[in-house]
Amino acid sequence: MRIKVCGIKRVEDAVMAAYCGADAIGLVVGRKHNSDDFIDKHLAQKIVRECPPYISPVLVTELDDAEEISGLVHETGVTSVQLHSDCTVDSIISLRKTFPNIKIIKNFHVIGPGVIHAMKPFESVVDAFILDTLDLANDKVGSTGLVHDWSISRKIVKEVSRPVILAGGLTPENVGEAIRVVNPYGVDASSGLKDSNGFKDEMKVINFVHRAKNDFFKVRNLSLEN
């Protein structure tokens, strides 16, 4: 079970997430929609530089141009990129040619069962998928605080050949159930881990990581017994 804390906006929050047991942090750079989590590339670079060992900084971007994304990857020094845009297969192939060793995660919004058909062409060019919730009313494509239909996500996990990360309204209170229902490769939370000032709350992060790991091992043990 891999755990990502997204929407990191301070060095101290990145360090805290690492010490709480997160495997990755998300740095949201390259804005096209509404979000409180966007930071500029210079702050992202600083956070990447000061990340502790054994944690992966992920560039989360809404840009869809391969050249622009490549520029951000180069300048920030991230090892993974998460695409929240209408990137084409060809754009991802182009990005891969420039950075052959980078991990590429493609976002899809779970708006109905048909989403799996949109995902299929990307299976051969990405390293993983992330499933999130769309909030058109507030012009948000991520960090919406809204859950989607986990039964669809569960079906996607079974039918695609790439690892699937679950996002969308996850909190310390519901992450265990989400893992039991969906059985994803990883989970990703942002808004559900914030304090009243919009930064990451340490106790929420601790509880999220603990419950995610705990319920994953319960699911894993059951599968091994069967």
Swiss-Prot record:
Pathway of action: Amino-acid biosynthesis; L-tryptophan biosynthesis; L-tryptophan from chorismate: step 3/5
Organism taxonomic ancestry: Archaea, Methanobacteriati, Methanobacteriota, Stenosarchaea group, Methanomicrobia
The name this protein goes by in its record: N-(5'-phosphoribosyl)anthranilate isomerase 2
Similarity-based family: Belongs to the TrpF family.
Swiss-Prot/TrEMBL GO biological process terms: L-tryptophan biosynthetic process
E.C. no: 5.3.1.24
InterPro entries: Aldolase_TIM, PRAI_dom, RibuloseP-bd_barrel, TrpF_fam
Keywords in alphabetical order: Amino-acid biosynthesis, Aromatic amino acid biosynthesis, Isomerase, Tryptophan biosynthesis
UniProt xrefs under HAMAP family: PRAI
Pfam families (UniProt xref): PRAI
GO molecular function, one term: phosphoribosylanthranilate isomerase activity
Reactions performed catalytically: N-(5-phospho-beta-D-ribosyl)anthranilate = 1-(2-carboxyphenylamino)-1-deoxy-D-ribulose 5-phosphate
